[in-house]
Amino acid sequence: LTVGGKQFEADGDPDTGATDYDITSFQHIYVVGAGKGVQLVVKAIEDVLGDYLTGGEIICKHGDPMLVKKVHVTMGSHPTPDHGCVEGCQRILNLSSRITENDLVFTVIMNGGSSLLTCPADGITLEDTIEVTRLMQIELGVTTRKLNALRNHIDKLKGGKLLRLFSRATLINLCGADLNRAFDIGKTDFQYLVKENYWLHNVPDGTTYEGALQTIKEFNVEERIPASVMRLLRSQSPENASL
């Protein structure tokens, strides 16, 4: 459900319907995620699962109070990322290397996850990523939709790539959105979400490399975007999405 909005309908989702999980059948149960309100969700998971929860890694905003005990919290910056964001992502990457088919993993993405879940792609520096956000969103006022069409493709985790890391495990993907009537996404089903998604990074991405280049061209900033970013975008198949 969206707060003050219409209900999400899972029509068209091949996995629609209630699912039962025998939590005693899993060797480990982890939580990973990022967002300004992610601790509220993770605390609820901790409260429900108790000792069945092994641990996990989440990234929150600097200044957030500590609400969770079993899951490790890394603090990062929003709206422009910092080294804390990268450190938290590296911890998620490290955790993913230990995951097996006998594990259950909750992924949780909340508002602010696009900044907090920042792990620059090979050849891209954190400073490059910061400059993209500063230029496009802070200076030029580009919408988050158009900004993410760009930064989803210069990152190791955004744009659904988080799912690949934990694909060996059984996954439960929780998507949170704090929306109001002024930002009502309307009646949304699964197929529309997958096609249009640009900010829920534990759902397949709906943006493309071609869309990223179009956004840069639209704002006439080819010469201002870091050269490493332009090289990466131009080297990829134009129509490919992140996942």
Where do the protein language model's features map onto the residues?
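Non-transmembrane, aqueous-exposed alpha-helical and coiled segments at domain scale
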Residues: 1-108, 114-243
